[in-house]
Amino acid sequence: MIPGQMLKGNLEDCVLIIISMKEAYGYEIVQKLEEFGFGSIAEGTVYPLLLRLEKQGFVVTEMRASEHGPKRKYYRITPEGKKEILSFIASFRELAEAVENLMLEVAKNEQTD
């Protein structure tokens, strides 16, 4: 499981990526996060995050009827949301490369000790 502190700064953009793949409602997004290996993330964590994404203009919402109960709020990515994803991916790749370089250096030093 991914430690919460590592997720903290990235979860919002990961949710945005999930929404970019397919319009989705809150609980569906929580399920997708679990499917992708993020572990069990509480809906109480995801809903405020979705509200922030909406306020930032990265997603728009639409209420739709559900076959299984009350209406559901579906989230759809906006052009601004797509730009945010591209920015996140570029930044994350940079970070991943720096961490990889650091880990390689540690491994190299362990071999010489």
Regions found by a protein language model. Give the residues of each.
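Short beta-strand/turn micro-motifs at beta-sheet edges
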Residues: 1-5, 62-64
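A cross-family signal for key residues in well-ordered alpha-helices
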Residues: 17, 31, 51, 60, ...
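Basic, amphipathic "hinge/linker" alpha-helix immediately C-terminal to the N-terminal HTH DNA-binding motif
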Residues: 71-89
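Short, hydrophobic-biased segments on the C-terminal half of alpha helices
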Residues: 47-54
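Amphipathic alpha-helical dimerization/coiled-coil segments
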Residues: 83-113
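N-terminal helix-turn-helix DNA-binding core of bacterial DNA-binding proteins
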Residues: 3-47
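Beta-hairpin "wing" of winged helix-turn-helix
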Residues: 56-71, 76
